Regions:
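Tryptophan-centered motif/residue detector
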Residues: 101, 125-126, 224, 264-266, ...
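Histidine-centered active-site/metal-ligand motif
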Residues: 109, 229, 322
Length: 374
């Protein structure tokens, strides 16, 4: 359904990912995108902090203490308010989009993330990319129209789009409580022909191994063990940043209750954001970008996929989707990881060949959780 109005379009059917680790198949003024963090022409991220959010169209929302909250009045907080960006033109046509946010939503409150796009002059309806709070969160199924569809956390387009717009609705059932929003990041990419950029760039010429604590997903509750690579990886990175989040706590805090999965990418980064970190989903196009994060002492959660024989020294033979932590590089450029699917803690830290890792990561979208101190 294509609608020029700001009202949410009818639910647009997307097949949800089967488990937590499967990678998805791949009249306000225009806002200038933020400086790209990756090579132009393939994928970029627009990151809006409080200054950009405060300059968006606000309805029932105000800036308070460095975050956007519901606009309190004498009767308390209203039931809802919206933050709507201007239409953001992109320097290249894109076919895939993943939004992220850093927010808080105490008991009785929540937020909704929506995206719409302009494709060849036609504006889509609003697609819901998540309903989120600290205690309840879920993706929205059955969203499909002629322009695109939602696959859990990812907007996939049938037509190339040249612009997008986001809208966040802050919701409260308690007049004494409000959610707050401090960061929105939107990654968009053209994936039909794969990400351009060097698959294997030169080795960094230095050795670095960040002291990321080790955790194994296979030590978790048996019925969850094979489904929780993402929260286990996230827990390792949070512990690196001195946030005492246990693996079970993170598992509970990222679960997509609509699909019963734990690998909803924005829900994982939102959990990190709720701990006071800056965290969002991005895509990289080369190993150099990954090296830059390690050089800045920032471990990265990456999403990989591989068939038998494609990744030597892995604890498993193959996977249709898996997340792990990149913690460093050897002197010859190989990749040091914490792989959560290792059977015990002693085997979590591993080294993967540089070319093989680049192939199983970048060839399948280069997805990364970028997590840093705010």
């Amino acid at each position: 359904v294509v609608s020029p109005t700001p009202d949410p379009s009818p639910p647009i059917n997307a097949t949800a990912r089967a488990d937590a680790t499967v990678i998805p198949t791949a009249s306000r003024p225009i806002v200038t995108p933020a400086t790209p963090t990756t090579e132009p022409g393939t994928t970029q991220v627009v990151k809006h902090g409080v200054p950009e959010l405060a300059s968006a169209s606000l309805a029932g929302v105000r800036l308070v203490g460095g975050t956007l909250t519901l606009d309190q009045n004498t009767g308390g907080y209203p039931q809802s308010g919206t933050i709507t960006s201007g239409e953001i033109a992109t320097p290249f046509a894109f076919d895939t989009l993943v939004p992220s946010w850093n927010a808080t939503a105490p008991t009785g409150t929540s937020l909704r993330c929506e995206i719409r796009v302009r494709a060849n002059g036609t504006r889509s309806g609003w697609y819901v990319l998540g309903n989120w709070s600290a205690s309840q969160r879920g993706s929205v199924s059955n969203q499909r129209d002629s322009i695109g569809s939602v696959d859990v956390d990812t907007l996939k387009l049938n037509l190339p789009a040249q612009a997008f717009q986001y809208r966040f609705t802050l919701i409260s059932a308690d007049p004494k409580q409000t959610p707050s929003l401090r960061l929105v990041a939107v990654n968009y990419a053209s994936l039909r022909d794969g990400l351009r950029g060097p698959a294997v760039s030169p080795a960094p010429g230095w050795f670095r191994d960040l002291p990321v604590p080790v955790q194994s997903q296979l030590l978790q509750t048996a019925n969850l063990a094979w489904d929780v690579c993402s929260p286990t990886s996230l827990a390792m990175v949070l512990q690196y940043w001195k946030i005492p989040a246990s693996v079970p706590e993170v598992i509970s805090g990222v679960r997509d209750q609509t699909n019963g999965i734990y690998g909803n990418w924005p829900f994982n980064t939102a959990f990190a954001g709720r701990q006071g970190l800056e965290a969002y989903v991005n895509r990289f196009t080369s190993m150099v970008e990954l090296q830059n994060e390690i050089a800045a002492s920032r471990p990265v959660v990456t999403s990989i996929r591989f068939a038998a024989g494609e990744l030597a020294n892995a604890p498993i033979t193959s996977t249709s989707g898996h997340l792990l932590v990149v913690r460093g590089f050897t002197a010859n450029g190989d990749v040091i990881v914490n792989d959560p699917v290792a059977p015990n803690l002693a085997e979590v830290r591993r080294v993967y060949q540089r070319a093989q890792f680049a192939n199983v990561w970048l060839r399948h979208g280069g997805v990364a959780y970028q997590i840093r101190q705010a």
